[in-house]
């Protein structure tokens, strides 16, 4: 018996079931919802809370490990950026067949689940995350991460300055002026740990543990996602860590 009602409703769904073009790089950006209020409720340390930074970094790593095609992730403040590639070979299948609604809803759910499950703050408060996804040309992948890292540094400078000065004193001040004002108080932003200034980067790194093929005897090394909290400024040089990852995945940089 034909289900005419069900077929009609499914056609409504299909109208908004958009998909990204296959074999094109995808960026997923996940943001904490109202984290300014959340950090107050959980009594996070100002200007930088190492527990929150580590939790966000580990959440990024969890997403990289559980999202098919993800080659790297970048974390700064309450924001996570992921790069997905599904063009490694002709058999590569995109995550959820590149269905946009699935990608944004599940990535936000994964972030929310892991973050709240591993929240060790004394003052508990559930966190929520939203997500967006879009495609970028291969040559603009590095530009995207440069853009987000610049925002990270700008926010880092402002957070440090706000811990020492009132909003009135900081009004219309440039980042360089804020750095100097912090120096006047005895704190040099340039000397802070790199992950306070530039964020954290998650990528696959080759393990030292060998894997031996029982049939051929060939030795290979498994790659695991690691968290790098000592990154420097992203730049257009092959030796830059993000460029190294893109080159390994056959992405054209320039």
Regions found by a protein language model. Give the residues of each.
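Regulatory and interdomain segments flanking nucleotide-handling catalytic cores
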Residues: 1-254
């Amino acid at each position: 018996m034909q289900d005419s009602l069900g077929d009609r409703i499914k056609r409504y769904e299909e109208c908004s079931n958009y998909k990204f073009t296959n074999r094109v790089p995808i960026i997923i950006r996940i943001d904490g919802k109202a984290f300014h209020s959340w950090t107050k409720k959980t009594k996070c340390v100002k200007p930088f809370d190492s527990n929150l930074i580590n939790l966000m970094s580990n959440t990024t790593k969890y997403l990289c490990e559980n999202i098919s095609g993800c080659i790297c992730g970048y974390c700064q403040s309450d924001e996570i950026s992921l790069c997905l590639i599904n063009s490694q070979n002709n058999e590569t299948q995109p995550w959820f067949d590149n269905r946009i609604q699935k990608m944004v809803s599940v990535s936000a759910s994964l972030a929310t689940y892991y973050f709240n499950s591993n929240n060790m703050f004394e003052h508990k408060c559930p966190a929520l995350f939203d997500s967006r996804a879009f495609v970028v040309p291969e040559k603009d992948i590095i530009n995207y991460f440069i853009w987000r890292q610049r925002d990270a540094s700008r926010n880092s400078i402002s957070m440090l300055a706000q811990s020492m000065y009132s909003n009135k004193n900081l009004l219309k001040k440039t980042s360089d002026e804020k750095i100097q004002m912090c120096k006047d108080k005895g704190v040099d932003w340039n000397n802070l740990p790199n992950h306070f200034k530039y964020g954290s980067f998650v990528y696959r790194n080759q393990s030292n543990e060998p894997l031996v093929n029982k049939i051929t005897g060939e030795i290979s090394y498994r790659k695991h996602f690691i968290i790098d909290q000592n990154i420097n400024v992203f730049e257009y040089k092959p030796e830059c860590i993000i460029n190294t990852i893109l080159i390994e995945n056959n992405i054209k940089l320039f």
